[in-house]
């Protein structure tokens, strides 16, 4: 009762990285609240799944194993969470802001009339004062996310209804194993008690999984371009520099919206979150929405003609100049010195 729950997204028999990241965060939240961390795994052929999950500090793993639970379809997974939560009454539920999470989260929160905050960039525990009614709420989940196009950061709380639900994008939270030998309880549930046969009305006939075009999230060096790159041709220069540095190329939302780069390269609150050892920002002003996706980089270098650009305030090094001037010089230098 009143524990922290994480819904585990599973591809085949492998737990998704975003779910493991949320287990890490969930463990920290549970420690602050003095409660347990529980996880829910629903799929097929899940024997031994606990080996992937318990090391993240999970006190109880709820397993639902049945042929109709993979590939994912909406109704069975919704019934599992709704009926389980009616029994267990969690205070917090976290899930990935993925295609599945964006489908499942609203269904569950609507069924439980609990509300949900999508695409959170931070999750914290705190106090909320309702000055109008003179009520103070302790130990609420602060669901923090950029709002109004990334121009402000909003802190959202849910004082009355439970569970407090939030989705988080992959890469926003850090994935850290707590203890390889962590001892947690594994509960294998009778799926039929939670899911009516009518929920299996949708059958997945075939699946086509598109391979990733790049490894932006895992790259040690990321070169990102903004609207200041001016054109697709400007981005070609970044790809040329990336080739010399064995880096990946990312983009700000403004650059993607302008058609300079593909959407799958977008870094920020509505794109990918990256934590490279080196991040080179070229022609990026540094709106809150973008900074949320790269602020944990080891070293940040900003190439910008505006000395007052917001991104310069978090950069370790600032090169004050136009990208048309600076980027070709970087390419020339590394071509000369990498041989």
How should these model regions be labeled?
Residues 1-339:
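N-terminal glycine-rich FAD/FM-binding segment characteristic of electron-transfer flavoproteins
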